[in-house]
A protein has these predicted regions:
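Bacterial Sec signal peptide processing site at the extreme N-terminus
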Residues: 10-31
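Processing junctions and N-termini across compartments
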Residues: 10, 38, 98-100, 117
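Mid-chain, structured segments of secreted extracytoplasmic proteins
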Residues: 67-104
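Post-signal-peptide N-terminal segment of Sec-exported extracytoplasmic proteins
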Residues: 31-73, 84-86
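Extracellular/mature segments of secreted proteins
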Residues: 24-25, 52-54, 129-136
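Sec-dependent signal peptide recognition
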Residues: 2-8
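C-terminal partner/receptor-binding element of secreted or periplasmic proteins
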Residues: 101-138
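Sequence contexts marking disulfide-bonded cysteines in secreted/extracellular proteins
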Residues: 17, 43-45, 122-124
Length: 138
């Protein structure tokens, strides 16, 4: 019985520490660094993507340490999920910057990839911290 508890605890702890890198195989299609926090950027992208007119269902997940976020696009319930590609955006917070990686399946929807990456760029500009803002004299 103790053995099962130890094995179960080890499995639970290893799952909590695992990142999102193993969800879609292969190298990212695109990777870019942005001077913003991952939580803010991923939330902005998720909300904007939900507002798109598309047959995709968008979801947002956070890692247990809140340093990695994942926004996925999959086929909605109305459409067979196997007929639509899957797209993943991985947001990796590194200090005050975030690396964004985009992966999609082999049958990728290039229009979706372009639209979603445009949202990432737009959101990065919206949530970026102003660099060396100077006070305005009265």
């Amino acid at each position: 019985m103790k053995r099962l508890v130890v094995i179960g605890l080890a499995c639970l702890l290893s799952a909590c520490q695992s990142g999102f890198a193993d969800l879609l195989p292969g190298q990212p299609e695109k990777t870019t660094d942005y001077p913003t926090m991952g939580a803010d950027l991923s939330d902005c992208v998720y909300r904007a993507a939900q507002g798109m007119r598309s047959p995709y269902l968008f979801r947002r997940k956070a890692s247990t340490n809140n340093l990695e976020f994942l926004v996925t696009a999959t086929g909605s319930n109305a459409v067979k999920p196997s007929t639509l590609p899957k797209l993943e955006l991985r947001f990796i917070t590194q200090g005050e910057a975030t690396t964004v990686e985009m992966r999609d399946t082999a049958i990728g929807d290039h229009e979706l990839s372009h639209d979603v990456w445009s949202i990432v760029d737009r959101c990065a500009q919206q949530v970026a911290k102003p660099s060396a803002a100077k006070p305005i004299a009265p």
